[in-house]
């Protein structure tokens, strides 16, 4: 057997040999890890790998970017850098039963007619984005909050089913792959066997093990954990000029392109026509759930036609054209030993069941939500009852039923408190609402704690380093009583906290100072107004353009805002009618909190104001995302479907049904050249 030391040749021949070995080993890796079809014996694979390692060690300048030797892990990182996604990585809405899915199907059918669905198992892992530039893996990132994730490129390179270079000749300049990292059952069991032998703490379930392994700062540890990856979608795809591309007209076709690129795709993907076939697929996968090599918590159902997906579009956090059809949660019986009442940020008083610990759905559960007084009455549950506990959506434990024949004689009624268990204020229940609330407002310490945590959180003011535990200590030590007090903190006060040295305190003070400059939408969201999430806060800011205008708006004015109904408008008006809330806002502004003014666009700057435009087909000179942004900057609303209210349709190459409908309705159509002239490129 010839070893690496016996290779003879010129420098250029050495380089060529390294390239040959790299390509050959990568082909064998795809055959083994992606196609489940080993092409050579293990001993021969090891010989090739040893040859490559030896040559790269002697000639490191010739190592290829997709060399399989990169998979063993490198130097440990100090932290993961944050990176922005090319387009948001959204979550999916859930269907928990057939009724939910039927409602989803009806919503789609009403908008775009009957559709073929593409179904696949819902892996219980971590969503990631892979970016290949000119075919080579450039970056990998976690989903994070959907807009910003963490750069895990080094760790992803250790996963053997992830190709470092895409296969084939017809590869676009930029390909973003969305998929799931998971730990197969066998790898999970082996990992826990090793931990048990060492006396280390065991991982609770494969998902936790995968999460902990993928986020190791030392990639050598990740490399040892036998993680796997399945691709489930394409993200941004662009040509050499940065124009967006659509690689196939169907989702199934796009998955086939991913397979051709050498990426692993679940073999359980199936096309389903109509409700009956979807339900049959769901039942089949549920039946085989425990036989699969990986854990799943449901199936994902997507509209197969890409143009129909584009017509359906998105809601704030999820696509309208896909849904996660969750499996029934695992259930167990246990005993309700008591009930505590917790107070949340908005004053909601929630009964929390204290349970005899029970192992269900991969975790030990000792608490479960009882939601509200109506739920307690519906269940007819008493302290001392034997109850059936379920992890709803395999995440949130809840009591779903009582076992009446096991009720003990000493069972006690659950009494909802008349006064807040934290501050003693009256507990009120507004007519028409199921939730009872503490009337104490920020006088209530529990509400104050949660309000300040929310104010400092990432999606709100984002004070880096101001986590929940820090806020808890600040309140316990009476250093902070309201959000404005956060901006009065200094190094000497912060060093009074546990595990807060001078350096950490200095960094936190700098983060507090940096957080003073924000945006009006983030500030509104940070205030914690009931029912005002990020999207509503952005709509309020866009509509009124100033805090003063929002403060002065009545319910009639507020319901003119996009997606704001009567209930939300009443919550907003009520919030700004409270003197204490206005005092908090004034104190924040006095502390230096500021944001750039939102200027009213001039009519000249927004000639398309009030018009609805639709994009269809492939735009070669600029991507669809850029075109949408340019049109919106000119005042247009860009919609996903054509209707009689559409003012104009921009038709790129391979325009489909939207163009046909526009022509049928007599709506003006602009080609790409006309669009470029309009936006002034």
Swiss-Prot record:
<dbReference type="InterPro" id="IPR004150">
    <property type="entry name" value="NAD_DNA_ligase_OB"/>
</dbReference>
<dbReference type="InterPro" id="IPR013839">
    <property type="entry name" value="DNAligase_adenylation"/>
</dbReference>
<dbReference type="GO" id="GO:0006281">
    <property type="term" value="P:DNA repair"/>
</dbReference>
<comment type="similarity">
    <text>Belongs to the NAD-dependent DNA ligase family. LigA subfamily.</text>
</comment>
<dbReference type="InterPro" id="IPR010994">
    <property type="entry name" value="RuvA_2-like"/>
</dbReference>
<keyword id="KW-0436">Ligase</keyword>
<dbReference type="InterPro" id="IPR001357">
    <property type="entry name" value="BRCT_dom"/>
</dbReference>
<keyword id="KW-0479">Metal-binding</keyword>
<dbReference type="InterPro" id="IPR018239">
    <property type="entry name" value="DNA_ligase_AS"/>
</dbReference>
<feature type="binding site">
    <location>
        <position position="423"/>
    </location>
    <ligand>
        <name>Zn(2+)</name>
    </ligand>
</feature>
<keyword id="KW-0235">DNA replication</keyword>
<dbReference type="InterPro" id="IPR041663">
    <property type="entry name" value="DisA/LigA_HHH"/>
</dbReference>
<dbReference type="GO" id="GO:0005829">
    <property type="term" value="C:cytosol"/>
</dbReference>
<dbReference type="InterPro" id="IPR033136">
    <property type="entry name" value="DNA_ligase_CS"/>
</dbReference>
<feature type="binding site">
    <location>
        <position position="444"/>
    </location>
    <ligand>
        <name>Zn(2+)</name>
    </ligand>
</feature>
<keyword id="KW-0460">Magnesium</keyword>
<feature type="binding site">
    <location>
        <position position="180"/>
    </location>
    <ligand>
        <name>NAD(+)</name>
    </ligand>
</feature>
<dbReference type="Pfam" id="PF03119">
    <property type="entry name" value="DNA_ligase_ZBD"/>
</dbReference>
<dbReference type="InterPro" id="IPR004149">
    <property type="entry name" value="Znf_DNAligase_C4"/>
</dbReference>
<dbReference type="GO" id="GO:0006260">
    <property type="term" value="P:DNA replication"/>
</dbReference>
<dbReference type="InterPro" id="IPR012340">
    <property type="entry name" value="NA-bd_OB-fold"/>
</dbReference>
<keyword id="KW-0227">DNA damage</keyword>
<feature type="binding site">
    <location>
        <position position="302"/>
    </location>
    <ligand>
        <name>NAD(+)</name>
    </ligand>
</feature>
<dbReference type="Pfam" id="PF00533">
    <property type="entry name" value="BRCT"/>
</dbReference>
<feature type="binding site">
    <location>
        <begin position="42"/>
        <end position="46"/>
    </location>
    <ligand>
        <name>NAD(+)</name>
    </ligand>
</feature>
<dbReference type="Pfam" id="PF22745">
    <property type="entry name" value="Nlig-Ia"/>
</dbReference>
<dbReference type="GO" id="GO:0003911">
    <property type="term" value="F:DNA ligase (NAD+) activity"/>
</dbReference>
<feature type="binding site">
    <location>
        <position position="438"/>
    </location>
    <ligand>
        <name>Zn(2+)</name>
    </ligand>
</feature>
<protein>
    <recommendedName>
        <fullName>DNA ligase</fullName>
        <ecNumber>6.5.1.2</ecNumber>
    </recommendedName>
</protein>
<dbReference type="Pfam" id="PF12826">
    <property type="entry name" value="HHH_2"/>
</dbReference>
<feature type="binding site">
    <location>
        <begin position="91"/>
        <end position="92"/>
    </location>
    <ligand>
        <name>NAD(+)</name>
    </ligand>
</feature>
<dbReference type="InterPro" id="IPR001679">
    <property type="entry name" value="DNA_ligase"/>
</dbReference>
<feature type="binding site">
    <location>
        <position position="420"/>
    </location>
    <ligand>
        <name>Zn(2+)</name>
    </ligand>
</feature>
<dbReference type="Pfam" id="PF01653">
    <property type="entry name" value="DNA_ligase_aden"/>
</dbReference>
<feature type="binding site">
    <location>
        <position position="326"/>
    </location>
    <ligand>
        <name>NAD(+)</name>
    </ligand>
</feature>
<dbReference type="Pfam" id="PF03120">
    <property type="entry name" value="DNA_ligase_OB"/>
</dbReference>
<feature type="active site" description="N6-AMP-lysine intermediate">
    <location>
        <position position="122"/>
    </location>
</feature>
<dbReference type="InterPro" id="IPR013840">
    <property type="entry name" value="DNAligase_N"/>
</dbReference>
<dbReference type="GO" id="GO:0046872">
    <property type="term" value="F:metal ion binding"/>
</dbReference>
<comment type="function">
    <text>DNA ligase that catalyzes the formation of phosphodiester linkages between 5'-phosphoryl and 3'-hydroxyl groups in double-stranded DNA using NAD as a coenzyme and as the energy source for the reaction. It is essential for DNA replication and repair of damaged DNA.</text>
</comment>
<keyword id="KW-0520">NAD</keyword>
<dbReference type="InterPro" id="IPR036420">
    <property type="entry name" value="BRCT_dom_sf"/>
</dbReference>
């Amino acid at each position: 057997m010839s070893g690496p030391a016996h290779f003879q040749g010129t420098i250029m021949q050495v380089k060529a040999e390294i390239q040959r070995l790299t390509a050959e080993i990568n082909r064998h890796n795809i055959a083994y890890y992606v196609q489940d079809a080993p092409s050579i014996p293990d001993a021969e694979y090891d010989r090739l790998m040893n040859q490559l390692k030896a040559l790269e060690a002697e000639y490191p300048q010739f190592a290829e970017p997709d060399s399989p030797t990169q998979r063993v892990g490198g130097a440990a990182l100090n932290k993961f850098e944050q990176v922005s996604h090319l387009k948001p990585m959204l979550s999916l809405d859930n269907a928990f039963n057939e009724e939910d899915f039927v409602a989803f199907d009806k919503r789609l059918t009403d908008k775009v007619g009957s559709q073929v669905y593409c179904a696949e198992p819902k892996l219980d892992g971590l969503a990631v984005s892979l970016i290949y530039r000119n075919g080579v893996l450039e970056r990998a990132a976690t989903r994070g909050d959907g807009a910003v994730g963490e750069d895990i490129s080094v760790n992803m390179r250790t996963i053997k089913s992830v190709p470092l270079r895409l296969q084939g000749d017809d590869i676009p300049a930029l390909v973003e792959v969305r998929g799931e990292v998971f730990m197969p059952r066998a790898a999970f069991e082996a990992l826990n066997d090793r931990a048990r032998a060492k006396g280390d703490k065991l991982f609770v379930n494969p998902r936790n093990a995968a999460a902990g392994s993928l986020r190791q700062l030392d990639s050598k540890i990740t490399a040892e954990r036998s993680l796997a990856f399945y691709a489930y979608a394409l993200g941004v795809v662009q040509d050499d000029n940065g124009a967006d591309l659509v690689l196939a007209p169907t989702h199934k076709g796009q998955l086939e392109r991913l397979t051709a690129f050498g990426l692993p795709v679940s073999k359980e993907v199936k096309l389903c026509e109509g409700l009956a076939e979807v339900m049959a697929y769901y039942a089949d996968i549920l039946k085989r759930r425990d036989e699969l090599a990986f854990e799943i918590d449901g199936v994902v159902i997507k509209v197969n036609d890409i143009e129909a997906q584009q017509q359906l579009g998105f809601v704030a956090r999820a696509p309208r054209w896909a849904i996660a059809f969750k499996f029934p949660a695992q259930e167990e019986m246990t005993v309700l030993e008591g009930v505590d009442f917790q107070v949340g940020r908005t004053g909601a008083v929630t009964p929390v069941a204290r349970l005899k610990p029970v192992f269900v759905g991969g975790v030990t559960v000792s608490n479960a939500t009882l939601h509200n007084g109506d739920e307690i009455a519906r269940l007819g549950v008493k302290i001392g009852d034997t109850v059936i506990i379920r992890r709803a959506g395999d995440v949130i434990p809840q009591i779903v039923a009582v076992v009446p024949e096991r009720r003990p004689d000493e069972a006690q009624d659950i009494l909802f408190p008349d006064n807040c268990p934290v501050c003693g204020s009256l507990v009120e229940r507004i007519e028409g609402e199921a939730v009872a609330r503490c009337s104490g407002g920020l006088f209530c310490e529990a509400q104050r704690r949660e309000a300040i945590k929310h104010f400092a959180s990432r999606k709100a003011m984002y004070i880096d380093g101001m986590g929940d535990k820090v806020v808890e200590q600040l309140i316990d030590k009476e250093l902070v009583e309201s959000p404005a007090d956060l901006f009065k903190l200094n190094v000497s006060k912060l060093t009074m906290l546990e595990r807060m040295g001078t350096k950490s305190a200095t960094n936190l003070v700098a983060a507090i100072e940096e957080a003073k400059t924000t945006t009006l939408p983030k500030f509104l969201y940070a205030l914690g107004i009931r029912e005002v999430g990020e999207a509503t806060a952005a709509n309020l800011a866009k509509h009124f353009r100033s805090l003063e205008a929002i403060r002065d708006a009545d319910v009639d004015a507020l319901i003119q805002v996009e997606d704001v109904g009567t209930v939300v408008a009443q919550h907003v008006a009520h919030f700004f009618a409270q003197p204490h809330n206005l005092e908090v806002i004034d104190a924040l502004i006095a502390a230096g909190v500021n944001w750039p003014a939102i200027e009213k666009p001039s009519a000249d700057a927004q000639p398309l104001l009030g018009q609805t435009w639709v994009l269809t087909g492939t735009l070669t000179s600029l991507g669809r995302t850029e075109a949408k942004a340019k049109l919106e900057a000119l005042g247009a609303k860009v919609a996903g479907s054509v209707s009689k209210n559409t003012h104009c349709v921009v038709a790129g190459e391979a325009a489909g049904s939207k163009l046909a409908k526009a022509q049928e309705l007599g709506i003006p159509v602009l080609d790409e050249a006309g669009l470029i002239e309009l936006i002034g490129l």
